[in-house]
């Protein structure tokens, strides 16, 4: 999947807040992802408890099938535990059944599905789309 563009301000805001992380292998950035500690814009009525949220996970096209996602999930699970969070959460387009199944094989359960309206906290490409909401324990 190719992500629509995010504004420089949004990306710089995540860097400044220390929420954007990179995965480096042999001095090359092979992946990036962001974390959040709440997500009411996407999770809405499902937003309860203190979870660690993973967002915008992306990997270099030249780096498929090398366990990058598993490494990110392991790191996030450890951070989730260290920070005393209730669990780890991810979301994706509800139509992305391949990624939903991938997460389920890694211990995530489908909590629900939510169609988002126009929300100034979210980029326009989120508006009107349905998202699958998944969570697991920190140490799954």
Q: Can you name each region flagged by the protein language model?
A:
Residues 1-13:
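Conserved GNAT-fold acetyl-CoA-binding loop/helix
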Residues 12-22, 39, 53, 127:
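A short helix-loop-beta-strand connector motif used in the catalytic cores of GNAT acetyltransferases and
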Residues 18-36:
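Conserved beta-hairpin
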Residues 32-64, 117-125:
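Conserved acyl-donor/pantetheine-binding loop and adjacent beta-alpha core of acyl/acetyltransferases
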Residues 50-51, 86, 93-96, 106, ...:
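C-terminal "cap" of GNAT-fold acetyltransferases
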Residues 59, 65-78, 101-105:
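Conserved acetyl-CoA-binding loop-helix of GNAT-fold acetyltransferases
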Residues 112-114:
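Conserved S-adenosyl-L-methionine
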């Amino acid at each position: 999947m190719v992500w629509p563009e995010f504004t420089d301000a949004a990306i710089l805001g995540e860097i400044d807040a220390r929420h954007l992380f990179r995965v480096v292998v042999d001095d090359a950035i092979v992946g990036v992802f962001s974390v959040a500690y709440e997500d009411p814009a996407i999770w809405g009525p499902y937003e309860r408890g203190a979870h660690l949220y993973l967002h915008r996970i992306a990997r270099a096209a030249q780096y498929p099938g090398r366990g990058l996602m598993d490494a990110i999930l392991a790191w996030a699970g450890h951070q989730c535990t260290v920070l005393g969070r209730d669990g780890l959460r991810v979301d994706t387009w509800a139509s992305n059944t391949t990624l939903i199944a991938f997460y389920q094989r890694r211990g995530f359960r489908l909590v629900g599905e939510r169609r988002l309206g126009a929300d100034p906290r979210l980029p326009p490409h989120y508006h009107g789309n349905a998202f699958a909401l998944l969570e697991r324990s920190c140490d799954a």
